[in-house]
Amino acid sequence: MSYFNDNDFDVFKSCNILRNESDIRQARKVIKDKLLDINEDINQKMNDMGLYHHKDTAHIVSLLTPCEFNHGKVNWIGIRYGKHPSEIDELNFGADKEDIYGFQKHCCFQLDVCYSGVEMGIFHAVPRGSVDRMYCHQMLDSGDADFKSRLIKAVEGIVGYGFVWNVGVDGLSMDDFKGESFVFDEVEDVGEEFVKWYSKVDCEYRYSSLLCHYGRKDERISSIEGIEDEFFKVVERLRGLYDVMCWRKL
């Protein structure tokens, strides 16, 4: 039997994502426990790479109940690794924001379970107040040639692995944007084209993530060992891009 099975994936059916009854909460907890077992296996190696989960162990796994932070729906559950908690605290100093959300306002590596399978990659930005989104747009808007060159080089290095950048809507968005995707493996002159696309499409009030999708029956995610091995591969492939697009306080 696969590590995540159809019962797990079906937790994210459209009829379930708004629910908060005891049976669906228990089904979500099963997924949470499996993700915590993955975290137990990979956390030290992630730390060795300078990547860390939320400082509060209660928030290693994303929220299991519909609330304001997930816009009232649970359509995926995952774990994230990013900047060291002390760095986030310093960057967030003086900001009026919830701590649980503060971590998510910074670019993170993500492994999540959804209805169609498993996703791995980078969660770049929440709709409002994302630190690294602001940094990237400031650098591009200022015409920083070195930043753009490094970004293009990093983008060119991730072609051929099935990565897709998705930008989705926030419920508070005031325009008619319905979401767009950039498929890296299908674009010529991918670096320059991505910069143009990102500059135009990625903006406040929109979610933004770079993910590789693994279908339910994908052999690479059939075991916990396979999932962990694949996640390390994804982190290695995307690390250069992550480093370029993250704002670090010097």
How should each PLM-predicted stretch be described?
Residues 1-57, 169-250:
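Long, solvent-exposed, polar/charged low-complexity segments
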Residues 15, 67, 107-108, 114, ...:
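Generic recognition of cysteine residues
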Residues 19-22, 29, 116-189:
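Compact, glycine/acidic-enriched structural inserts
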Residues 28, 62-63, 93-96:
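Short secondary-structure boundary micro-motifs
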Residues 42-89:
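Glycine-rich, compositionally biased intrinsically disordered regions
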Residues 72-152:
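Aromatic- and glycine-enriched beta-alpha-beta binding-site module
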Residues 73-96, 108, 159, 165-200:
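Aromatic/basic-lined ligand-recognition segments
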